Amino acid sequence: MTDAAHLRRRTEELLAAHPPATTDRLDFLRARFDAGLAWVHFPQGLGGLGVPRSLQAVVDAELAAAGAPDNDPRRIGIGLGMAAPTILQYGTEEQKSRLLRPLWTGEEVWCQLFSEPGAGSDLAALGTRAVRDGEDWVVNGQKVWTSSAHLARWAILIARTDPDLPKHKGITYFLCDMTDPGVEVRPLRQITGEAEFNEVFLTDVRIPDAMRLGEVGDGWRVAQTTLNNERVAIGGTAVPREGGMIGKIAATWRERPDLRTHDLHQRLLGLWVEAEVARLTGVRLRQQLVAGQPGPEGAGMKLNFARLNQEISGLEVELLGEEGLLYDDWTMRRPELVNFTGRDAGYRYLRSKGNSIEGGTSEVLLNIVAERVLGLPAEPRTDKDVAWKDLAR
């Protein structure tokens, strides 16, 4: 029996044992994970069957046709796209067994404690400290622009464990329980009125050494797995043709012939072609994951995602004229989903402004593409081989 046929049979068995029409959503997701049909390329016992990642489409198609419930990447995207692949590569067997199932089902939401007020684009300059105390690490510092921290049970965290080493070398990667004493989450309100992001203060937070990911001092290398997956997750998300931002403006174009002009038509066609190229590039980028780690090419995909979202949402506002500017819902909200295309045109236009900042600023990503994809010389650095504690701040 081929792998595809085997997966179809297992999917049929899952549906027979847990009919979607009569099974609780969460119970179904747990059963799907236990059947190895959550992410089929993961090992057996961890939600997968150890088969090629490309075969996930077989399972997804069968379950969609049966009307089966699924998890929501808009709510748990950080866990699915960033934490899970990092835990799979660097985690202990105990960490994988404890964390991956509730991560995938959405029972436990994850957030990312990386950026700091003084270390965003230059992330390796981070100053949050982790000091060893017996079997624990005591963490103190501040993180910022943390999506979903107000919902999260767990966080992926990088902190400085050796200030005497150069900035990239004295960092260690941890898994932080967001319910621990000393963790304080405060909302950061955006120009849309909502507070999707947060700042997180860590005061004498004790993290067991058993929740360290990778070796002490090797956190920067571990974090590259997270960051590369983040850029693929943001820029290379699977989108159907005429989905996403381009789908919104295309729908408006069809519904409102009174707004059409030849100039707007030509510009919309150009953006539609670019969106289709980006969609197909995303397909190719995701195929790279089948063979293993995503590379720095994800930076280019994320760059294009930000530019396209901003241009398309800008054209939509221009198309609608005064109607496109009628965004007046500044109610303080704490959303449970990250939704770039939700609500109306005014919201999409305002929200898209953050796309060129989150997940790495466009300027930083241009450097990554230049140095790691094109092989151009790196920019001159004055902090190379200088201890972090001696850097000007």
Explain the meaning of each model-derived region:
Residues 1-77, 88, 98, 102, ...:
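Amphipathic, small/basic residue-rich leader segments at the start of a protein or domain
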Residues 23, 262-265, 276-337:
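C-terminal helix-coil-helix/basic helical segment that borders enzyme active sites and/or dimer interfaces
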Residues 33, 313-349, 359-368, 379-385:
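A glycine-biased, small/acidic residue-tolerant capping/turn segment at secondary-structure junctions
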Residues 106-114, 158:
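A short, Trp-centered hydrophobic/proline-enriched beta-strand micro-motif
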Residues 135, 140-186:
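A short core secondary-structure module
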Residues 183-280, 355, 389-391:
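Glycine-rich beta->alpha junctions and the first turn(s) of the following alpha-helix
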